Amino acid sequence: MVVMSAPTEPKSRPGTTGQRESAPEDVTASPWVTIVWDDPVNLMTYVTYVFQKLFGYSEPHATKLMLQVHNEGKAVVSAGSREAMEVDVSKLHAAGLWATMQQDR
């Protein structure tokens, strides 16, 4: 039988307190956004359809976002927690759209 002990904390370096530093509160509290990028493949009607189905947007709102993607090259389509934006990006990728996420500052 093998007995394993609990992991121990690493020893601190000289000149440090041994405590981990956390990110500033304002950075971790900032919302994240999902960005859809223009691509040469998907039809504008399809992009509008995807925005309606995935996000529940009305046709006018989905069309506005699609036109922003088409004319400006990108559009923010959702905002929220990092985990929620990871899910949104995955869904958009599954639908064949180019999407990324970034922290909104």
Curated annotation (Swiss-Prot):
GO BP, sorted A to Z: protein catabolic process; proteolysis
SUPFAM superfamilies hit by this protein: ClpS-like
Location of region: Disordered: 1-27
InterPro entries in alphabetical order: ClpS, ClpS_core, Ribosomal_bL12_C/ClpS-like
Pfam (any one): ClpS
Family to which the UniProt record says this protein belongs: Belongs to the ClpS family.
Function: Involved in the modulation of the specificity of the ClpAP-mediated ATP-dependent protein degradation.
Subunit structure, interactors included: Binds to the N-terminal domain of the chaperone ClpA.
HAMAP family: ClpS
Name of the protein described by the UniProt record: ATP-dependent Clp protease adapter protein ClpS
Lineage: Bacteria, Bacillati, Actinomycetota, Actinomycetes, Mycobacteriales
